[in-house]
Amino acid sequence: MPTGPVSPVSPVSPVSSVSSVGPATPAPGVQPHIHQPHHSSSALTPTPVSVPVLPPELDDVQAKPRHGETVARRAGRALRRVFASSAAAETEAVTRAAHAIQQPVTTGRQLAVSSIRGGAGKSTVAALLALTYAHYRADPVLAVEADPALGTLPHRLGVREVRWSGTDLAQIVDPSMLITDLTGYLLPFTGGGWLLPGSQGSIGARLDLDTYRIVMTSLRRHFATTVVDCETLPAEVARTALVTTQARVLVTPATVEGVRATKSVLEWMGGVHRGLLPTAVVVLNHTSPDGGIDVRKAAEHLGAGGAAVLPLPYDRHLAGGGAVRTELLGERTREAAARLAAEVMDRAVSRGPGGRQREGAREG
């Protein structure tokens, strides 16, 4: 992410099979120039009008963003680094994560993020993943909002206005389009990634299954990494995304109830296909500063079928809502986001745990 000891690692070059046209880095929330490709289908589709993500009257409601950690905690960590040797170990861990995040892909990797209920932090985790991949990878990164009714991905990514939605794009997308055609219908977010909103914030807006399939199939060859913020389960698009993507992330509150519900989802996934669990990652999201479960025991319970289980610590900045500003995240949160992105990419590339080692063994 933009802050953190990542200088020892340089981003890898994108592979030839994935479009190497790198994303621009315009200011957050700025609508790019709409480059209309000359296709007959686009001429039949009316151009949507840009609408704000949040109504103007709510501008003053959002409190000033806070740092993810208190001043005392940050000062304590600085002192420990002065008198201990943990800094080198932390740098090594981040470097390992960066290598995993940056590993080359031969075809686009699509990563689904879902949860069993609203309020688990699904859109927040999707935003963290999208920001992390956009920061570390040199090839194009896309975030797709597949939860148009209740998702908050555009807001979390700092987008101020939305225009084209997934439904709009599905009506005009054409196999002959280049990535430079497509980005005219997308929104840039901090770090160089692109966002495809699910709607213009309309109540009752839905993304039907056919539209989802058209969008995901059409965009895969242009984007090396796609993070999909799905509806909560058991919605049809969410179930389809969990089965058809290369890796899946289940976000659950770090509570006993959340663990129990997520265990049921994992059992369902294992019944659909035994190969789904080794490519699944469960995020235990701490939404309060007081931990309510034993993370180690919860990981043992949820990981029995092969899924990875990673904690996301409580962070004041994330808990406050609004756009995720990576410079305000607590250090533990940045490290957790990097570990999560690395684990998800490993499993998406290798279709299971221990990915790079297993792939290397096959090639040898």
Predicted regions and their residues:
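Compositionally biased, intrinsically disordered low-complexity segments enriched
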Residues: 2-26
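Extreme N-terminal, non-catalytic leader segments
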Residues: 27-112
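Walker A (P-loop) phosphate-binding motif
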Residues: 101-135
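Phosphate-binding loop that captures ATP/GTP phosphates
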Residues: 134-193
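Phosphate-binding/switch loop-helix module in NTP-utilizing enzymes
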Residues: 187-238
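Conserved catalytic-core segment of NTP-binding enzymes
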Residues: 214-215, 225-307
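Beta-strand-loop-alpha "switch" segments that mediate conformational coupling across diverse proteins
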Residues: 286-330, 337
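NTP-binding/hydrolysis catalytic cores, primarily Walker-type P-loop NTPases
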Residues: 321-364
